[in-house]
C-alpha cells in the first residue's frame, strides 16, 4: 500500500493525472471490463423487444390462419434466454466493478488517512475533525457507489441508444430519422443542464451543505444554552444564515434548470407525438396490401423500441449528475492529499540540552495577512518555568504552538538545546516535548490505553505510578473495570477536570524534558483544581516548562513571565520585577486583584 501511496503522491503536481483510475491501480482494468460487460448486457437486453416484435409480425402476417406454433415457441424461448443471458452478463459486470470500487475506496481512505498522519498538528487546528471525516469517509463512499453501480449503468445507458438508433435506421430510415429528431433535441437540452457549469454547481452545493452541517453540530452542542435562556434558532445567527444560504442556492439552482428541464422532458416524451402521426401518414400513402401491413408493423417496432431510448436518456441525466458528484468528492480528497507536510531533515539532530531560544520570530496564519507574531525573541533556560500572559489574541498560544512545530515560522528560528526545531525531525522533537491542553481529548478506549498512548510499551505498573502522580486514583477506583474501563460507552464519562488529570497522567508517563501547558485549571472545579495543581507540580519537576496562563495567580512563582501584546513581547521578568516596572503586567495584576475581591451586590 505504501508503494501505491507513493505512486499517487508523485502524480499530484500534475492535477490532471490523478483520477479514480489512479486509486484503482491494477483493478482499473476490472472497471473497464465491467463497463464493457454492462454495454454488452444492455445490447442483449434489446433482444426480447425484437422477439416481441417478431411474434406480433408473425401474428399479423399469418392472420387469419394463425402463426406457426414452432416459430412462436422459438421466439418466446429466445426472449427468455436473452433476458437470462443479459442478467448473467450484468451480474458479471457488477462483480468486476464492485471489486474495483472496493479497492479504490480503500486506497482513497488509506492514502488520505496516512497522509493526515504526516501533516503538522497546526493543520488540524484550522480543519475540524468532522469536516475531515465527511470528506474522506463520505467521499470514498460516494465514489465507491459511483464505480460499483452508476458507472456500469452509465455505460449501458450510453450504448443502448446507439444500438437502438442503428436498429431504427436499419428497419426503416424514415421512421429512424423521425425518431432521431426529438431524441437529438433532448440530448441538446440534456447537455445544457449537465454542461461545464454543473461542476461548479456541485462544488457550491457541497460547500453549502458542509457549512450547514458544521453549523448544525455547533447548534446541537449549544442546545442547553438555547433551552436555558429560551432562545430560538434565530439566536444562532450563523446556523440560521447557513440554512438560508443553502435554501437560496437550492431554489436558484432549481429555477435555473426549469426551462432546459421542461424542454428536455417535452422533447424526449414527445417522440410518440411525432412518430405516430408520421407513421399513420406513411401508412396512408402506402398501397393497401403488403406495403401497408409492413409500414404498420414497422411503426409497431418503433413504438416498442423508442421508450427504451427515453428510459436510457433519463438514466444518462441522473448518472451524469452522479459523475460530477464523484469527481467533486475525489477533488476534495485530493485537496487533503495535496497539503504538504513540513519538510524533514535528511539527518535529524539531537539537542544538547533543553534550553529554548526563540530568535526574531515572525509568523502569520494567512501568509498575506497580519502577523500573529512580529519579531519575537526570548529565552527559557533549561529547567526553568516560564509563563505567557496577555490579552486574548496577543499571540500566547501561537508562540507556544511554534515550539513543537505545529507550524513553521515565517522568519527567524526556534531552537532547543542549540538545535533548530526544523533540523531535529518530527520524531525527535516529539520525544522532547509533552503537551497538556485545556481541551484534552480522550480516545474511545480503555483508560489504560488512553494513558499509555504517550508510551505504548509502558507496562501496567508504570501506568499506575503515573496515575498516582497525577492524583487519578479516585477516578480509577470508581470505574467499573478500573483501568480497563472504556471511556465513552455504557454511561462512562469523565468531567472536564477528570479528563485534565488523565491527560496529566499521560504527560507524566511520557516524561519528556520539556512541558508545554495551556493552564489546565482554568475551567476546573475547586476539588479538581487542587488535584490538578498537585499533579502539575509532579509533572514539572526538573523540566523546562512554558505555561500559557489565564489566571495571574498561577504565574507568581514562575522564573520568568513574558507579557504578550499584539504579537510582541511587551515585558518580561519575574512577578516582583514586573510589578515594580508599573507597566502592562502591573495593570493586569491590579485588575485581577479587583476581580478576585469583587462580590455580588458589592458586599464583602
Language-model-detected regions and their locations in the chain:
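Cytoplasmic juxtamembrane "membrane-exit" helices immediately C-terminal to transmembrane segments
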Residues: 95-103, 107, 192-211, 320
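Cytosolic ends of transmembrane helices, especially the final helix of ABC transmembrane type-1 domains
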Residues: 231, 255-258, 308-336
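Membrane-integrated ABC transporters
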Residues: 1-45, 64-75, 93, 97, ...
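Transmembrane-helix motif of ABC transporter permease domains
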Residues: 29-48, 61-105, 294-304, 311-312
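ABC-type nucleotide-binding domain
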Residues: 352-604
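An intracellular "coupling" helix at the cytosolic face of ABC transporter transmembrane type-1 domains
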Residues: 21, 25-29, 121, 138-147, ...
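A hydrophobic transmembrane-helix motif
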Residues: 43-54, 85-88, 152-195, 253-301, ...
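Short intracellular "coupling" helices and adjacent cytoplasmic loop segments at the cytosolic face
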Residues: 2-11, 102, 111-140, 215-238, ...
Amino acid at each position: 500500500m505504501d508503494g501505491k501511496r507513493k505512486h499517487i503522491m508523485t502524480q499530484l503536481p500534475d492535477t490532471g493525472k490523478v483520477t479514480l483510475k489512479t486509486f484503482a491501480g491494477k483493478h482499473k482494468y476490472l472497471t473497464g471490463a465491467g463497463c464493457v460487460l454492462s454495454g454488452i448486457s444492455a445490447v442483449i437486453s434489446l433482444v426480447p423487444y425484437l422477439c416481441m416484435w417478431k411474434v406480433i409480425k408473425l401474428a399479423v402476417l399469418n392472420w387469419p390462419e394463425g402463426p406457426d406454433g414452432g416459430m412462436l415457441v422459438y421466439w418466446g424461448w429466445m426472449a427468455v434466454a436473452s433476458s437470462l443471458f443479459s442478467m448473467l452478463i450484468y451480474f458479471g459486470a457488477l462483480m468486476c466493478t464492485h471489486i474495483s470500487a472496493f479497492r479504490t475506496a480503500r486506497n482513497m481512505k488509506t492514502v488520505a488517512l496516512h497522509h493526515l498522519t504526516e501533516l503538522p498538528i497546526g493543520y488540524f487546528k484550522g480543519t475540524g475533525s468532522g469536516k475531515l471525516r465527511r470528506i474522506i469517509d463520505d467521499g470514498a463512499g460516494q465514489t465507491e457507489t459511483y464505480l460499483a453501480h452508476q458507472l456500469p449503468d452509465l455505460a449501458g445507458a450510453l450504448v443502448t441508444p446507439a444500438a437502438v438508433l442503428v436498429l431504427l435506421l436499419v428497419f426503416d430510415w424514415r421512421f429512424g430519422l423521425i425518431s432521431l429528431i426529438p431524441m437529438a433535441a433532448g440530448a441538446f437540452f440534456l447537455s445544457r443542464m449537465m454542461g461545464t457549469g454543473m461542476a461548479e454547481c456541485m462544488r457550491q452545493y457541497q460547500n453549502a451543505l458542509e457549512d450547514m452541517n458544521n453549523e448544525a453540530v455547533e447548534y446541537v452542542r449549544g442546545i442547553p444554552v438555547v433551552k436555558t435562556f429560551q432562545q430560538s434558532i434565530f439566536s444562532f445567527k450563523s446556523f440560521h444564515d447557513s440554512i438560508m444560504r443553502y435554501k437560496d442556492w437550492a431554489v436558484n439552482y432549481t429555477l435555473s434548470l426549469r426551462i432546459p428541464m421542461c424542454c428536455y422532458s417535452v422533447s424526449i416524451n414527445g417522440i410518440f407525438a411525432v412518430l405516430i402521426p408520421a407513421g399513420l401518414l406513411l401508412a396512408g400513402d402506402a398501397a393497401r396490401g403488403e406495403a401497408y401491413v409492413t409500414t404498420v408493423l414497422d411503426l409497431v417496432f418503433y413504438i416498442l423500441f423508442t421508450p427504451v431510448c427515453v428510459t436510457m436518456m433519463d438514466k444518462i441525466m441522473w448518472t451524469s449528475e452522479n459523475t460530477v458528484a464523484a469527481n467533486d468528492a475525489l477533488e476534495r480528497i485530493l485537496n487533503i492529499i495535496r497539503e504538504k507536510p513540513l519538510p524533514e531533515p535528511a539527518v535529524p539532530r539531537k539537542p544538547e540540552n533543553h534550553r529554548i531560544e526563540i530568535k526574531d520570530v515572525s509568523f502569520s496564519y494567512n501568509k498575506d495577512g497580519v502577523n500573529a507574531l512580529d519579531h519575537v525573541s526570548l529565552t527559557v533556560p533549561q529547567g526553568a518555568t516560564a509563563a505567557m500572559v496577555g490579552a486574548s489574541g496577543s499571540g500566547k498560544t501561537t508562540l507556544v504552538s511554534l515550539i513543537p512545530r505545529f507550524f513553521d515560522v515565517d522568519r527567524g528560528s526556534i531552537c532547543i538545546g542549540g538545535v533548530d526545531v526544523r533540523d531535529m525531525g518530527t520524531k525527535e522533537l516529539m520525544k522532547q516535548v509533552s503537551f497538556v491542553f485545556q481541551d484534552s481529548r480522550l480516545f474511545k478506549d480503555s483508560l489504560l490505553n488512553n494513558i499509555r498512548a504517550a508510551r505504548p510499551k509502558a507496562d501496567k505498573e508504570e501506568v499506575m505510578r503515573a496515575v498516582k502522580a497525577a492524583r487519578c486514583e479516585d477516578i480509577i477506583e470508581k470505574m467499573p473495570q478500573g483501568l480497563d474501563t472504556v471511556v465513552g460507552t455504557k454511561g462512562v464519562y469523565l468531567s472536564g477536570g477528570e479528563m485534565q488529570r488523565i491527560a496529566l497522567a499521560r504527560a507524566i508517563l511520557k516524561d519528556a524534558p520539556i512541558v508545554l501547558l495551556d493552564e489546565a485549571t482554568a475551567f476546573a472545579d475547586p476539588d479538581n483544581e487542587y488535584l490538578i495543581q498537585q499533579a502539575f507540580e509532579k509533572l514539572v519537576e526538573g523540566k523546562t516548562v512554558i505555561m500559557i496562563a489565564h489566571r495571574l495567580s498561577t504565574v507568581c512563582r514562575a522564573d520568568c513571565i513574558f507579557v504578550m501584546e499584539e504579537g510582541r513581547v511587551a515585558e518580561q521578568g519575574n512577578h516582583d520585577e514586573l510589578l515594580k516596572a508599573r507597566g502592562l503586567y502591573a495593570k493586569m495584576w491590579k485588575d485581577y486583584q479587583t476581580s478576585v475581591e469583587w462580590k455580588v451586590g458589592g458586599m464583602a
